[in-house]
Amino acid sequence: VKHIRPTVEKCLETSLNEIELFEVKCFLLRCHEMLPLFQQVQSALQWEGIGLEDTVQALDLLDPERNRVASFFISDNSSPLLRSLRREKRELEEQIRRLPAGEEREEVQARRVRVASEEELEEMRIRKELSAALRPHVPALLYNTEMIGEIALTVEKARLARRYGG
C-alpha cells in the first residue's frame, strides 16, 4: 500500500488534484478490502488496538457509482454544467474534424478552447468540493495509515525472526 500520509494531510489545508484524489481512492479501496481481514484477525487473536476504521463513506465520495475499481475521473454526473460543457466540447471537436482549414475552423477551435477552459474551472470546483467533503474523514485515514504501517512492520519483523531463527 502506497504511503499517502502527506497527501491526506494536504487535504486538511487545500484541494487535492486529480492524481492525489486517485491515490486517496486507491488507499480507500485497499482499506475497504482489508477491513474484513483485520476484523477477523482482531477477533481471532483478541488483539486490542489493532484494526482499521471503516472508511466506506469516504470511498463513496470518490466512487459514487460504487464501481470499486482503481481509477479516478470526474464523471459527467458530477454536475449538470460539467456534463453540458463536455457535450459541447465533443460537438465542437467533431465540427473541427469535418471543417476544412480556414477562418470558420479557427473560430470553432477558439470556441473549443473557451469551452475546455470552462470545463477545467468546473472540474477544479468539483475537486475543491470533494477535498472539503473528505476532510472530516482525514483522522480515520491517518489512523488507517498508521495501522497498516504497524502491521507491515510486525510482519517484516516476524519474517526476519523466522529467517534468522529468532
For each predicted feature, which ranges?
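Long amphipathic alpha-helical segments that form oligomerization/scaffold cores
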Residues: 39-53, 57
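Alpha-helical coupling/stalk and coiled-coil linker elements that connect catalytic or binding modules
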Residues: 1, 5-35, 62-166
